[in-house]
Amino acid sequence: MKAKIRGSSLLPPRNRSRRPMTDLEQMVADLLDDLKIEFEREKPLKYLQGWRYFDFHLIEHGILIEVDGAYWHGDNPKPSYVAMMAKKNDMIKNWLAKKEGYKLVRIKEKQLKEDFSSVKNIISGEINKNLSRN
């Protein structure tokens, strides 16, 4: 019986966070480490018969972070089907995070590469908002 449950979509796949981080995700992870913020990678949230994974979960703050790379979420030309699926997945994640009581912070590749200090300010600001609510 255990094998069936473990292999089903009732439980999130194991060891998901062992997927290598992208360079952009590594930048955010390093920032979170520098800020001494405890986080987990690839936070699963149940959606219908499957799971949606969020890049980072700030454990003590109820904040999820998605790092949006330029290819999938940016201005680069891409097939309309790819753009449509990325937009649909983003909308689902936005809704799911809100439904589950998380604040979702989206960080664009351009922000990380061109204005890194703003990323630090955004994350710190959301943490401070969360602390003032509690």
Language model regions located:
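Nucleic-acid endo/exonuclease domains
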Residues: 1-134
